[in-house]
Design a protein with these regions (language model features):
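Cytosolic regulatory regions of ion transport systems
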Residues: 1-196
Length: 196
Protein backbone atom coordinates (compact mmCIF):
# COMPACT_ATOMS: atom_id res chain seq x y z
CA UNK A 1 0.00 0.00 0.00
CA UNK A 2 1.30 3.45 -0.92
CA UNK A 3 0.37 6.38 1.32
CA UNK A 4 1.19 10.04 0.93
CA UNK A 5 1.24 11.00 4.62
CA UNK A 6 -0.52 13.85 6.31
CA UNK A 7 0.44 15.32 9.68
CA UNK A 8 -1.55 12.54 11.38
CA UNK A 9 0.50 9.69 9.91
CA UNK A 10 2.60 7.51 12.25
CA UNK A 11 5.62 5.62 10.99
CA UNK A 12 5.86 2.00 12.12
CA UNK A 13 8.67 -0.57 12.16
CA UNK A 14 9.07 -2.11 8.73
CA UNK A 15 7.59 0.85 6.85
CA UNK A 16 9.50 1.93 3.76
CA UNK A 17 9.75 5.64 3.18
CA UNK A 18 10.65 7.48 0.00
CA UNK A 19 11.82 11.07 0.23
CA UNK A 20 11.92 13.77 -2.39
CA UNK A 21 13.89 16.93 -1.73
CA UNK A 22 16.88 18.85 -2.94
CA UNK A 23 20.25 17.14 -2.52
CA UNK A 24 21.19 19.68 0.17
CA UNK A 25 18.00 19.08 2.17
CA UNK A 26 18.35 15.30 1.93
CA UNK A 27 21.97 15.48 3.09
CA UNK A 28 20.94 17.66 6.04
CA UNK A 29 18.09 15.27 6.93
CA UNK A 30 20.32 12.17 6.86
CA UNK A 31 23.07 13.93 8.83
CA UNK A 32 20.56 14.72 11.60
CA UNK A 33 19.65 11.03 11.76
CA UNK A 34 23.32 9.96 11.66
CA UNK A 35 22.59 8.07 8.45
CA UNK A 36 24.64 10.21 6.09
CA UNK A 37 27.13 8.31 3.94
CA UNK A 38 30.01 10.07 2.25
CA UNK A 39 29.79 10.25 -1.51
CA UNK A 40 31.43 7.42 -3.42
CA UNK A 41 34.99 8.12 -4.57
CA UNK A 42 36.02 4.65 -5.80
CA UNK A 43 33.63 2.88 -8.15
CA UNK A 44 33.97 -0.62 -9.61
CA UNK A 45 31.94 -1.54 -12.68
CA UNK A 46 31.73 -5.07 -14.06
CA UNK A 47 30.74 -5.13 -17.72
CA UNK A 48 31.84 -2.71 -20.45
CA UNK A 49 28.42 -2.20 -22.01
CA UNK A 50 27.14 0.90 -23.80
CA UNK A 51 25.61 1.98 -20.48
CA UNK A 52 29.09 1.68 -18.93
CA UNK A 53 30.46 4.26 -21.37
CA UNK A 54 27.85 6.80 -20.32
CA UNK A 55 28.31 6.05 -16.63
CA UNK A 56 32.12 6.26 -16.81
CA UNK A 57 31.91 9.62 -18.57
CA UNK A 58 29.59 10.96 -15.86
CA UNK A 59 31.80 9.58 -13.08
CA UNK A 60 34.95 11.06 -14.62
CA UNK A 61 33.26 14.43 -14.96
CA UNK A 62 32.79 14.49 -11.18
CA UNK A 63 36.31 13.19 -10.43
CA UNK A 64 35.56 9.64 -9.34
CA UNK A 65 38.17 6.86 -9.52
CA UNK A 66 36.73 4.13 -11.71
CA UNK A 67 37.72 0.50 -12.28
CA UNK A 68 36.04 -1.38 -15.14
CA UNK A 69 36.30 -5.16 -15.52
CA UNK A 70 35.20 -6.99 -18.67
CA UNK A 71 36.00 -10.31 -20.34
CA UNK A 72 35.99 -8.90 -23.89
CA UNK A 73 39.54 -7.79 -24.83
CA UNK A 74 38.35 -5.52 -27.66
CA UNK A 75 35.91 -3.68 -25.38
CA UNK A 76 38.61 -3.27 -22.75
CA UNK A 77 41.00 -1.83 -25.34
CA UNK A 78 38.33 0.56 -26.61
CA UNK A 79 37.38 1.60 -23.08
CA UNK A 80 41.00 2.25 -22.05
CA UNK A 81 41.62 4.35 -25.18
CA UNK A 82 38.47 6.38 -24.68
CA UNK A 83 38.99 6.86 -20.93
CA UNK A 84 42.73 6.97 -20.16
CA UNK A 85 42.13 7.85 -16.49
CA UNK A 86 40.09 4.69 -15.88
CA UNK A 87 41.64 1.43 -14.71
CA UNK A 88 40.36 -1.15 -17.22
CA UNK A 89 40.91 -4.81 -16.39
CA UNK A 90 40.53 -7.59 -18.95
CA UNK A 91 39.20 -10.53 -16.97
CA UNK A 92 36.20 -12.41 -15.68
CA UNK A 93 34.24 -10.02 -13.47
CA UNK A 94 32.57 -13.01 -11.81
CA UNK A 95 35.93 -14.33 -10.57
CA UNK A 96 36.04 -13.75 -6.81
CA UNK A 97 39.85 -13.83 -6.80
CA UNK A 98 40.05 -11.12 -9.48
CA UNK A 99 37.53 -8.95 -7.64
CA UNK A 100 39.59 -9.34 -4.48
CA UNK A 101 42.83 -8.46 -6.32
CA UNK A 102 41.15 -5.33 -7.66
CA UNK A 103 40.19 -4.32 -4.10
CA UNK A 104 36.43 -4.78 -4.15
CA UNK A 105 36.53 -4.38 -0.36
CA UNK A 106 37.85 -0.81 -0.74
CA UNK A 107 35.20 0.38 -3.20
CA UNK A 108 32.55 2.93 -2.28
CA UNK A 109 30.22 1.71 -5.02
CA UNK A 110 29.85 -1.43 -7.13
CA UNK A 111 27.83 -1.54 -10.36
CA UNK A 112 27.01 -4.76 -12.23
CA UNK A 113 26.39 -3.96 -15.91
CA UNK A 114 26.95 -7.25 -17.72
CA UNK A 115 24.49 -8.44 -20.35
CA UNK A 116 22.99 -11.11 -18.10
CA UNK A 117 20.47 -10.30 -15.37
CA UNK A 118 21.39 -13.36 -13.34
CA UNK A 119 25.09 -12.50 -13.41
CA UNK A 120 24.38 -8.92 -12.38
CA UNK A 121 22.22 -10.00 -9.45
CA UNK A 122 24.76 -12.55 -8.20
CA UNK A 123 27.66 -10.10 -8.62
CA UNK A 124 25.74 -7.42 -6.74
CA UNK A 125 24.91 -9.83 -3.92
CA UNK A 126 28.56 -10.90 -3.74
CA UNK A 127 29.74 -7.28 -3.64
CA UNK A 128 27.24 -6.57 -0.88
CA UNK A 129 28.65 -9.43 1.21
CA UNK A 130 32.26 -8.35 0.63
CA UNK A 131 31.75 -4.67 1.33
CA UNK A 132 29.24 -2.23 2.79
CA UNK A 133 29.40 -0.10 -0.35
CA UNK A 134 26.49 1.11 -2.47
CA UNK A 135 25.55 -1.74 -4.83
CA UNK A 136 23.65 -1.35 -8.10
CA UNK A 137 22.59 -4.05 -10.57
CA UNK A 138 21.26 -3.56 -14.09
CA UNK A 139 18.46 -5.89 -15.12
CA UNK A 140 16.56 -6.22 -18.36
CA UNK A 141 13.56 -8.11 -16.99
CA UNK A 142 11.70 -6.07 -14.41
CA UNK A 143 10.32 -9.31 -12.92
CA UNK A 144 13.78 -9.81 -11.36
CA UNK A 145 13.65 -6.50 -9.47
CA UNK A 146 12.07 -7.93 -6.31
CA UNK A 147 14.46 -10.88 -6.31
CA UNK A 148 17.45 -8.56 -6.67
CA UNK A 149 16.46 -6.29 -3.79
CA UNK A 150 15.29 -9.07 -1.44
CA UNK A 151 16.82 -8.98 2.04
CA UNK A 152 18.65 -5.74 1.29
CA UNK A 153 21.49 -7.45 -0.57
CA UNK A 154 21.28 -5.08 -3.56
CA UNK A 155 20.76 -1.37 -2.89
CA UNK A 156 19.42 -0.35 -6.29
CA UNK A 157 18.19 -2.03 -9.42
CA UNK A 158 18.14 -0.29 -12.78
CA UNK A 159 15.72 -1.88 -15.21
CA UNK A 160 16.49 -0.83 -18.77
CA UNK A 161 12.94 -1.58 -19.87
CA UNK A 162 11.32 0.44 -17.09
CA UNK A 163 13.79 3.32 -17.49
CA UNK A 164 12.99 3.54 -21.19
CA UNK A 165 9.23 3.29 -20.77
CA UNK A 166 9.32 5.68 -17.81
CA UNK A 167 11.30 8.23 -19.83
CA UNK A 168 8.79 8.06 -22.67
CA UNK A 169 5.82 8.26 -20.28
CA UNK A 170 7.39 11.19 -18.41
CA UNK A 171 7.94 13.05 -21.68
CA UNK A 172 4.39 12.45 -22.91
CA UNK A 173 2.86 13.41 -19.54
CA UNK A 174 5.07 16.47 -19.23
CA UNK A 175 4.00 17.60 -22.70
CA UNK A 176 0.35 16.92 -21.87
CA UNK A 177 0.58 18.68 -18.51
CA UNK A 178 2.45 21.65 -19.93
CA UNK A 179 -0.65 22.44 -21.96
CA UNK A 180 -2.88 22.12 -18.89
CA UNK A 181 -0.74 23.84 -16.26
CA UNK A 182 2.34 26.00 -16.23
CA UNK A 183 3.12 25.02 -12.61
CA UNK A 184 4.54 21.58 -13.45
CA UNK A 185 8.24 21.71 -14.31
CA UNK A 186 9.17 18.03 -14.05
CA UNK A 187 7.13 14.90 -13.43
CA UNK A 188 8.71 11.86 -11.76
CA UNK A 189 7.35 8.43 -10.92
CA UNK A 190 8.19 6.82 -7.57
CA UNK A 191 7.54 3.54 -5.76
CA UNK A 192 7.51 1.43 -8.89
CA UNK A 193 5.32 3.91 -10.75
CA UNK A 194 2.58 3.98 -8.10
CA UNK A 195 3.18 7.65 -7.24
CA UNK A 196 3.77 10.66 -9.51
Amino acid sequence: ETIIPTGMFTLRAGDKIYLTASARDLESFFRKLNLFKAKASNVMIVGASRMTYYLVKELQDIQKRVTVIDSDAARCQEMSEKFPGVLVIHGDGADAELLSEERITEMDAFVALTGLDETNIILAMYASQMNSCKVVAKINRSSFADLATAKGMVDSVVSTASVTSESIAMYVRAMQNSFESENIKTLHRLVGGRVE
